[in-house]
């Protein structure tokens, strides 16, 4: 997949604008506040039906309007047209090839996105939920049945927590547990299947950034690996009931990053953590591209401020080898001169 044209109308500070892109590395150059990140945000919005910058979606609509529209013409290799619009205090309206979508799942599947921005580098310190999203992104594209299993598991955990808060009888909660454990085991299997592919690829990519960086990468399914979830939920029932929350299960899954059994955030420098996140994101894209004709698109916001010149060069080299379409924002064109080639495309904002 690559985006050939993007049209924005009343999106953030862009009243109306059309952009043409290449199926290569596209550099978006402009001053702070010029709308560079808004272009990345609009592409991300097309894929996910949400923003990576704000949960207040009405704020995305230009203050002089009551609706924004994002439209793109992409190729995979056939032409694909995706549009998304939103009026103030209303819901998003998504269209794929002019057909209104009941949900956004198919568009997300058609338009796979990897985002790398300053907030991405907080994955290591943000808790298990953010790291688990790495697994779920990959499993979603690897296995078409994953989403339904994930949704059903999430529903059952929510139902169980609600039952705990309302002091439902234990027999009722046991009924929920039976269904939950069935779906949790399937979800665990699918996450593990992706993790088995991801782990060696992370090591491979990380070695290209810094061969001296060593760490252990392990998968935690969310409960004791030596016990069934049925047993764990039974043993933890009194505690769960006391605090009105399910403390064990697939919602607690994690990618555990350690050195000598110590969390890497206590050992890795900020710079080393950035390299690890780059390796994770690139590994995900490489796995995706190797198993899908529909290649992953990278959105990279102001990466030159996060990495030094040597590691930025390694990143660009790897991205070129992935043959993914890439969008990179920067405030200073002179910072990217060393990385330009005949296939590069510069858009000045």
From Swiss-Prot:
GO cellular component: cytoplasm
GO BP term, example: DNA synthesis involved in DNA repair
Localization terms from the record: Cytoplasm
An MF annotation (GO) of this entry: single-stranded DNA binding
Chief location bin: cytoplasm
Keyword tags: ATP-binding, Cytoplasm, DNA damage, DNA repair, DNA replication, DNA-binding, Nucleotide-binding, SOS response
Positions with a binding annotation for ATP: 30-37
Its biological purpose: The RecF protein is involved in DNA metabolism; it is required for DNA replication and normal SOS inducibility. RecF binds preferentially to single-stranded, linear DNA. It also seems to bind ATP.
Protein family membership: Belongs to the RecF family.
UniProt-recorded name of the protein: DNA replication and repair protein RecF
Higher taxonomy: Bacteria, Pseudomonadati, Pseudomonadota, Gammaproteobacteria, Thiotrichales
Gene transcribed to yield this protein: recF
